[in-house]
Swiss-Prot record:
This is tRNA uridine 5-carboxymethylaminomethyl modification enzyme MnmG. One of its GO terms (cellular component) is cytosol. Its main location: cytoplasm. Homodimer. Heterotetramer of two MnmE and two MnmG subunits. It comes from Thiobacillus denitrificans (strain ATCC 25259 / T1). Belongs to the MnmG family. It is found in: Cytoplasm. PROSITE patterns: GIDA_1, GIDA_2. FAD binds at residues 13-18.
Length: 632
């Protein structure tokens, strides 16, 4: 049957990418439908019970700055918060939270159910409906046709998902959920560039059977950091510690003894796993010289005893898993509640995507999340938001939007995907960004909220809060610049006590804040320092501006130098094989990739700086007709 209503945007999948995509499209006024195989699993944390981390926390803040749900949901569900790299510079500091799975799902579902313009429907999607080279809807398992002007596909690990435990395997989207077999087959019919990847998860432990006296406790930060720019510590539920233990020589012997029954090492699994979250089998093989590997025992929630042992992801047979767990200090009598497993699934080469995350070959069809070869909740959420807002923009007849590498980690993520593709599951790190000092967690709102408001994804409450914060940062900065101290006001003894050394001339408080040994609170203790600002985020912005503005200004100059070439658009129908002055290898790589901008072209493997110079010459000449393709 044909569903009586049609939609602007349909989102397929209710994970972290799908929920952000649906919310973003609906916030922009698009009539949106979210289809999921099971409404009870909306926003489920399929693997580890944590959000954030190095690079990942930056993405969460950017999603939040654009009105997304992940950060606020984490503030409402987080049972431990920590700032990683707190002793390092602000560019690489990152927030990480342990989340209660039940509370997190509830927070996401509450937002979905109360979002105007968003409809939920429980049905697995089996088919994409096309009109020529444009998607016009989807068909579900029951044969229901839903029509739409744009479709966002966020299928996670469900496309032809295959679960492995030892040499046993069976079809599943994740343990306990059916796979999307029909949809996977339909996508393969469309001749899109498909591959296989894999990921894994560890066995879960009953915390009542753990001897915590043999582990090291790891408490959260006090005071706890807050994830959302709209958040507050009062949102946080009760806080819980984590614990640290480690593998042993005996653990490694057990693993080596079971490798002949590992699907990974027996050649049963074809997909490539994540380099930066390897299975324990991979760890002891790749790092054979290490006597032990750290394991973090992470609570799954406030109302369960279940513990997630982060660091022993495995697809070894259950009897080997049992022996592994019991060889670990503190887990000698541990009871496994759920076995670990690996899952193999289809993904599609993201080089077939535009920067908007729309597929190049099928108009109106957007991909987000693990289908694009990424790993991680945060990477999925960021892509979902971008795909959802661009799907809405397309239905409104507006130009697509994607941030540049200098504007957001989201921009780095998308550019890496569509330019370089993936050979293994992609995860975000701060090291992937060229302009880290600009792309900090603390200034994600200053970088993106104004753009989000113009796009339509930022609501009035967030916009008002953003403007209040921006104004307060400006006022406090000017106040500190206007308050002066000199040796008469601050004698040598007092100066030595307060700031570590006497001052030899007059300084503004802002000048003194530039000193590496002085923080905001210490400057307020000086004569005329006053009460300062209560908002920790405002104080942080003021202090970072004082200490790092010189470096930031230099990086801005570097960005400006590259921006003109970076954003120079290349014709979509350009026949690179007919351009002279380029090597055959470069022409072939450009012809295959069809980069949208000169910046993307410059990051293609094998494309040299000399080749970019040649393209720049052609661009200035306007790519004359005799150098272009004569027909589409």
């Amino acid at each position: 049957m044909k569903f009586p209503e049609s939609f602007d945007v349909i989102v397929v999948g209710g994970g972290h990418a799908g929920t952000e995509a649906a919310l973003a499209a609906a916030r922009m006024g698009a009539k949106t439908l979210l289809l999921t195989h099971n409404i009870e699993t909306l926003g489920a944390m399929s693997c580890n019970p944590s959000i954030g981390g190095i690079g990942k926390g930056h993405l969460v803040r950017e999603v939040d700055a654009l009105g997304g749900a992940m950060a606020l949901a984490t503030d409402e569900a987080g049972i431990q918060f920590r700032t990683l790299n707190s002793s390092k510079g602000p560019a690489v500091r990152a927030t990480r939270a342990q989340a209660d799975r039940v509370l997190y799902k509830a927070a996401i579902r509450q937002r979905l159910e109360n979002q105007p313009g968003l409809t939920l429907f429980q049905q697995a999607v089996d088919d994409l409906v096309l009109d020529g080279a444009r998607v016009v809807g989807v068909k579900t398992q029951l044969g229901i046709l839903f029509e739409a002007r744009a479709v966002v596909l966020t299928a996670g690990t469900f496309l032809a998902g295959l679960v492995h435990v030892g040499l046993e395997n069976f079809q599943a989207g994740r343990m306990g959920d059916p796979p999307a077999v029909s949809l996977a087959a339909r996508l393969r019919e469309l001749d899109l560039p498909v591959g296989r990847l894999k990921t894994g998860t560890p066995p879960r432990i009953d915390g009542r059977t753990i001897d915590y006296s043999r582990t090291q406790v790891q408490p959260g930060d006090d005071p706890a950091p807050v994830f959302s720019f709209m958040g507050d510590r009062s949102m946080h539920p009760a806080q819980r510690p984590c614990w640290i233990t480690h593998t042993t020589v005996a653990t490694h012997e057990i693993i080596r003894g079971g490798l002949d029954r590992s699907p990974l090492y027996a050649g049963v699994i074809e997909g490539v796993g994540p380099r930066y979250c390897p299975s324990i089998e991979d760890k002891i093989t790749r790092f054979a010289d290490k006597a032990s590997h750290q394991i973090f025992l992470e609570p799954e929630g406030l109302t369960t005893h279940e513990i997630y042992p982060n660091g022993i992801s495995t697809s070894l047979p259950f009897d080997v898993q049992h022996a592994i767990v019991r060889s670990i200090p503190g887990l000698e009598h541990a009871h496994i509640l759920r076995p670990g497993y690996a899952i193999e699934y289809d993904y599609y080469d993201p080089r077939n995507l535009k920067a908007s995350l729309e597929t190049k070959s099928i108009a109106g069809l957007f991909f987000a999340g693990q289908i694009n070869g990424t790993t991680g909740y945060e990477e999925a959420a960021a892509q979902g938001l971008l795909a959802g807002l661009n799907a809405a923009l397309q239905t409104q007849g507006k130009d697509a939007w994607s941030p540049g590498r200098h504007e957001a980690y989201l921009g780095v993520l998308v550019d890496d995907l569509i330019t370089r593709g993936v050979s293994e599951p992609y995860r975000m790190f701060t090291s992937r960004a060229e302009y880290r000092l600009q792309l900090r967690e603390d200034n994600a709102d200053m970088r993106l909220t104004e753009t989000g408001r113009a796009l339509g994804v930022v609501d009035d409450a967030r916009w008002d809060q953003f403007n209040r914060k921006r104004d307060e940062v400006a006022r406090e900065t000017e106040r500190l610049k206007s308050v002066w101290v000199n040796p008469a006001i601050l004698p040598a003894d007092a100066a030595t006590q307060l700031i570590g050394q006497p001052i030899e001339r007059e300084y503004s408080l802002f000048d003194l804040l530039r000193r590496p040994n002085l923080g905001y609170a210490q400057v307020l203790a000086l004569p005329g320092g006053g009460a300062g600002v209560a908002d920790v985020g405002v104080a942080e912005q003021v202090e970072i501006a004082a200490k790092y503005q010189g470096y930031i200004d230099r990086q801005n100059e570097e960005v400006d130098k590259h921006r003109e070439q970076e954003g120079l658009r290349l014709p979509p129908d350009l026949d690179y094989t007919r351009l002279t002055g380029l090597s055959m290898e470069v022409r072939q790589r450009l012809q295959t990739a069809q980069p949208e901008t000169l910046g993307q072209a410059s990051r293609l493997q094998g494309v040299t700086p000399a080749a970019i110079s040649v393209l720049l010459v052609y661009a200035k000449r306007g790519f004359k007709p005799d150098e272009q393709k004569k027909s589409a």
